[in-house]
Regions:
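Internal helical hairpin/lid segments
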Residues: 228-320
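A conserved active-site cap/scaffold subdomain adjacent to cofactor or substrate pockets
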Residues: 167, 185-254
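Secondary-structure boundary elements
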Residues: 129-133, 155-162, 183-187, 215, ...
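Hydrophobic alpha-helical scaffolding
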Residues: 6, 67, 138, 142, ...
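Metallocofactor- and cofactor-centric catalytic cores in central/energy metabolism, strongly enriched
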Residues: 1-132, 146, 150, 154-159, ...
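Phosphate/pyrophosphate-binding betaalpha-module
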Residues: 138, 142-205
Length: 376
């Protein structure tokens, strides 16, 4: 398959791994952050950590939108959906994310009208099929998914779909990276830049990382060779004492991004003054709110939102894992009280969560090795 097979070619992967070993200074410890949760899963899925030198440490970043959502936002939306005339619609990733009083799926078991949709336009269809009810779409994601929400809001207004609104939780990636770099306990040498987000925003917004923070950043694809090539490019910059933005994912990511998608977002959203991120606290201008022109389709403007603020369960260490301070397995609950079957935190639920990735690929593998090596 074009653009897949060649990026999984064993010979090319071996050559890239050899180039990494050649470039890596054995007297230096490298800490590289992969920002995107999709990269985290690819790293574990393809076993890439096993081919890297031991002095290259990959740090998992905050690029999982479900994971960074504070519990209070889930509680706010579910409180609105307690109304029997409201249908709560969301992507499947959200269904098992716990709020204070349970996940949307658990609320569904108690009688709440909760539906899985696969796109915002599905939520509009749901509203048309249920004219006697109000459909509230729980929108989530970085700039990757925000344009589709924006276009759906424009469509709802144009077509006069009045029993539909969006509970907007879209966040932006650049302020999150800035918050990571501002953290006093985080030392990083470079970034593996997000692929999906960059298809929308392009590469230019990352230039401040190179210019002001003197950190290399390479926008990267999701195949094994993509990730290894990106590490080669970062190491080459570090060896030369350079810090710049490079685009390894040129087959998908244009330097200037997707202008039509950016325009749709600008026409429909504006920046919030601040927004709470799980593990990172309140970050200024880091999330999107719906413009007043679309107030009728904004759940937060249309209904009274409690503005609930809650803390994560005390024993859970989601914040430290999200910031890259702890590895998933270093959390006290990991693999014990917190598993994919019984998640305590969002990082164990989402398809992009680092805890879910580690559990599914590393933890299970370690348990299998232990079982096979144990005497009968």
């Amino acid at each position: 398959m074009k653009f897949v097979d060649e990026f999984r070619d064993p010979e090319l992967i071996t050559k890239a791994a050899e180039e990494i070993r050649r470039l890596a200074d054995p007297n230096r410890h490298y800490r590289l952050m992969e920002v995107c949760g999709g990269h985290t899963h690819a790293i574990y899925r393809f076993g890439l950590k096993d081919v890297l030198p031991t002095n290259i440490e990959l740090i998992h970043g905050p690029g999982c939108p479900v994971c960074v959502l504070p519990m209070g936002r889930i509680d706010d939306a579910l409180s609105l959906a307690m109304n029997p005339d409201v249908i709560f619609a969301a992507f499947g990733d959200m269904m098992r994310v716990p709020g204070t009083h349970g996940s949307p799926l658990e609320h569904k078991a108690r009688g709440m009208d909760v539906r899985i949709v696969y796109s915002p336009s599905d939520a509009i269809k749901l509203a048309r099929m249920n004219p006697q009810k109000h459909v509230m779409f729980f929108a989530i994601g970085f700039e990757t998914t925000a344009p589709s929400t924006a276009l759906t809001l424009q469509r709802a207004k144009a077509e006069g779909v009045h029993n539909f609104s969006v509970f907007c939780n879209h966040v932006t990636i650049i302020p999150a990276i800035r918050a990571i770099l501002d953290s006093p306990d985080m030392r990083l040498d470079g970034f593996i830049g997000p692929g999906h987000v960059s298809t929308v925003i392009g590469c230019r917004p990352y230039e401040w990382i190179a210019k002001n923070e003197h950190k290399p950043i390479v926008v990267c694809g999701f195949e094994p060779l993509d990730l290894l090539q990106s590490i080669v490019m970062i190491l080459a910059q570090l060896q030369k004492g350079e810090a710049k933005v490079e685009n390894q994912y040129k087959r998908v990511v244009p330097w200037e991004g997707n202008r039509a998608a950016l325009k749709a977002m600008a026409d429909t959203f504006q920046l919030r003054p601040y927004f709470e991120w799980r593990g990172l606290g309140f970050i200024s201008q880091s999330a999107l709110r719906i413009r007043d022109e679309y107030a009728e389709w904004d759940s937060e403007q249309r209904f009274h939102v409690p503005g609930i603020r809650v803390t994560d369960p005390k024993a859970a260490q989601c914040g430290e894992v999200l910031k890259g301070v702890l590895k998933p397995a270093q959390c006290k609950l990991f693999g014990k009280e917190c598993t994919p079957e019984n998640p305590v935190g969002a990082l164990m639920v989402s398809s992009e969560g680092s805890c879910a990735a580690y559990y599914n690929y590393e933890h299970r593998k370690a348990n299998l090795v232990t079982t096979l090596s144990s005497p009968a």
